[in-house]
Amino acid sequence: MGKNIRWIIVLLLFLVYMINYLDRVALSITVPMIEKDLALNAEQFGMIFGSFFFGYAVFNFIGGLAVDKFGATLVMGLAVGLWSLFCGLTAVATGFYSMLVLRVLFGMAEGPICASANKMINGWFPKKQAATAVGFLSAGSPLGGAVAGPIVGYLALAFGWRPAFMIIFAIGIVWMVVWFFIAANSPDKHKHVSQEELMLINKMKQEEDALETVENQTAHSLGYYLKQPIILVTAFAFFCYNYILFFFLSWFPSYLVQQHQSGY
C-alpha cells in the first residue's frame, strides 16, 4: 500500500463524514414523498427529526467510552454498519412509530463517529500534522450535505424513496468492508505500513513527547476544563451553529417544495 497509510485512513474518514451527512439529510429530502405515502404531518416529522438527536447526543458519550475500551477501528466500523442498516430500514417503515424508532436507533449508531475519528487521528498522526488531517476529514461533512440534495433527489425521483434508502444503505456497507480491510488503531498494529512511515511517525511523536516533558505540562481533570470560560463560550457557539444548521437541513427541502413548488 506504500508509505502513506495514514493519509489513506484520512481519506476513508473524509468519505465516511460525507456518507454520514448524506445519510442524515436523506430523510429531509424525501419528506414530501414520505408524507404522502405514510400520511404523516409536519408535527410528526418534527418529532421524528428531533428523536435522532436524543440518540445521537447520548451515544456521543457512550461512543467515546466504547472507543477507549474497544478501539476506534472496531467501533467506527460497527457504527457505520449499524447506522447504514437503520437508514436502509427506513425503506420498510410503515408509519410514524416505526419511523420514530428507526430515527432514534440511527442517531445512536451515528454517535461514536467523532470520537472514533479523533482517536484514529491521535493514533496515526503527531500533533504537528493532526490539525491538517482533521481539517481534511472534516471537509467531508459540508461536502456530504452539499451532494446529498442532488444524489438523494435523483435516486428518489428515478427509483422511489424506498429504493433510495436501500442504495444509501449499500454505500455505507461498502465503506465498512473497505475500512475493516485497511484500518488499524495505530501504525504499529497495521500489517502493511512501511517501515519508513512507521519510523517517521514514531520519530515525530517522540520529539513531541520529549518537548512536553521539558515543559512539564500539568494534567487537569475534566471538571477543570468544563469551568473554563473559553470552553463554555465555544460550546455555546457550537450549540447555536448546530441549531441553525440542522433547522435548515431538516426543514428547508420541505419548505422549497411546499412554498415554491420546487423539486418533486
Please tell me what each predicted stretch does.
Residues 102-142:
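Cytoplasmic helix-loop-helix junction between adjacent transmembrane helices
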Residues 58-97:
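Conserved MFS/SLC helix-loop-helix module at the cytosolic interface between two early adjacent transmembrane helices
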Residues 27-28, 221-264:
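Extracytoplasmic gate region of multi-pass secondary transporters
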Residues 8-42, 248-253:
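Extracytoplasmic
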Residues 39, 71, 92-98, 109, ...:
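Helix-breaking motifs and short loop linkers at transmembrane-helix boundaries and internal kinks
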Residues 25, 53-61, 111, 145-146:
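Residue-level signature of mid-helix packing/kink "hotspots" within the transmembrane helices
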Residues 34-35, 66-67, 151-159, 256-257:
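Interfacial helix-cap and linker-helix signal at transmembrane-aqueous boundaries
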Residues 137-190:
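Helix-loop-helix hairpin linking two adjacent transmembrane segments in secondary transporters
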